[in-house]
Amino acid sequence: MTLLYQMVHFALFASVAGECVTTLFQDACFKGGDITVAFAPNAKHCQIICTHHPRCLLFTFMTESSSEDPTKWYTCILKDSVTETLPMVNMTGAISGYSSKQCLHHISACSKDMYVDLNMKGMNYNSSLAQSARECQQRCTDDTHCHFFTFATRHFPSIKDRNTCLLKNTQTGTPTSITKLHEVVSGFSLKSCGLSNLACIRDIFPRTAFVDITIDTVMAPDPFVCRSICTHHPSCLFFTFLSEEWPTASERNLCLLKTSSSGLPSARFRKNRAFSGFSLQHCQHSVPVFCHSSFYRNTDFLGEELDIVDADSHEACQKTCTNSIRCQFFTYSPSQESCNGGKGKCYLKLSANGSPTKILHGTGSISGYTLRLCKMDNVCTTKIKTRIVGGTQSVHGEWPWQITLHVTSPTQRHLCGGAIIGNQWILTAAHCFNEVKSPNVLRVYSGILNQSEIKEDTSFFGVQEIIIHDQYEKAESGYDIALLKLETAMNYTDSQWPICLPSKGDRNVMYTECWVTGWGYRKLRDKIQNTLQKAKVPLMTNEECQAGYREHRITSKMVCAGYREGGKDACKGDSGGPLSCKHNEVWHLVGITSWGEGCGQRERPGVYSNVVEYVDWILEKTQGP
């Protein structure tokens, strides 16, 4: 079948510029604007590739029916346009769409789908036997160099190749081509899903240079940006950053992206003014997107200029850059004149790879990056402006991840607390459901401060599924943790926002600011409170906690918080609610309110499910196939 071009333009032009368009247009092709061509197993994956490409705004994907030439099948054509859109023409078998950079919802590079009868081609560097495609996928996920895989089933025509798991990679991280092949299954590494078991090394080592193969060099203002660039480069495993004080002027601010056959540096040398570290691609549930809110003073980022506008401040300049979909970074030059009202010049810029082409210092300017991609990160890491006010009563928006879980039978009432951890997921305590027989009687209310706000017409989320840890027996024995899957996904707002799960790599973090929140009793014989209560509580070692609960065993699955002298504590009605701790300006869900003796009794701290110990279980249930 030949390509069918019918020059019939769709009415889809400037009206969509800068807007979020999620529709995929069947039998349609964007005309012009080609940047590069990749290969993808379907249009949705092509959209993911476009979204994470520094310049792609639109794409066209070619299905099998688009051409009689199989080499053109599965091509993903990435496109750009100064007007942010392109004319669209009819083309049989083509599917077109827009990058999700314009969208406010969470975007992930995670792709768990399996593609039956597709052979995704690349360099086959490892071959082994596996029992299933899932086993092969996990093997790829746990291999440092693997980008994608192909598994030959037990019905594969060649007997000697049956159950073979081929691990593959390419320079770009995407297949070099995709062909039809019966009795094979292909898929991608799940590293970007946060499901790798490889070691996660978060340290950045000062006065250190790594050797081995340098696969690319880019400009970066600091080692943290360099690490982000390495993390999102398909082949970068570790990096060395040369600071602005590096003795060779032409090499200053260079970010050297590196790899090795072993996956680790073969040697490291002491070098002043150099910093080295590792990609975070292997880190579980914490792979960040390129999001940097820092301002770099007395610094000029060079690149292709998109526009020059007036701005009151560097913050306003960054906002303008963020609101311009093609802007990747900016430089703000403060005004030296008083006649223009103090406005400075805001230079909006971009480059082929999303990084400055050169970085100059001592210019008096202030530079930084767009925040547009920050929403694509695990949104919980956004440094939301929560303010902890005095007293014991919370205010609106103070704890945007806190929910109140109501049961409607026999009469509607507050049952437990819980925490938003995803747009369709609530983490709470298993013991809340000891008497609940069906999710149909549950309602989740978010953004609520006072229970009295809840009326018959107050919007809520229905619960599709209750997932209780299969090892749960009773709260005092541990495993007191449960997930609620909502019937519909929520949109994030200032009063409805997820909290981060703690990373398994952060087990030794010393949290110094922890708060427990809920509508529970303030004393043993009391009633549910109308206004959301809060209490700042210190974490306690399990040994200290065990001393107060000799009749129970305090395990690593539990974490305790409270004061030795008693007083502030969680109580009845707080169950399932969050123990929220702040670290590096990011809030983490350290505990889920589980059990305790009394309310705020001396040497009887509150006992919480230790969330970090359940991260794998949470990810399995919320991100599993």
From Swiss-Prot:
Q: Which residue range or ranges hold the Peptidase S1 domain?
A: 388-623
The record's keywords, sorted A to Z, are:
Blood coagulation, Disease variant, Disulfide bond, Glycoprotein, Hemostasis, Heparin-binding, Hydrolase, Protease, Repeat, Secreted, Serine protease, Signal, Zymogen
Q: Record's GO cellular component, any one? A: extracellular region
All disulfide bonds of the chain are 20-103, 46-76, 50-56, 110-193, 136-165, 140-146, 200-283, 226-255, 230-236, 291-374, 317-346, 321-327, 380-500, 416-432, 514-581, 545-560, 571-599
- Where can this protein be found? Secreted
Question: Where does this protein hold heparin?
Answer: 547-550
Q: Where in the sequence does glycosylation occur per the annotation?
A: 90, 126, 450, 491
Q: Which residues form the active site?
A: 431, 480, 575
Q: How is its activity regulated?
A: Inhibited by SERPINA5.
Q: Which domain of life is it from?
A: Eukaryota
Q: Per its record, how is this protein called by name?
A: Coagulation factor XI
Q: Which organism is it from?
A: Bos taurus (Bovine)
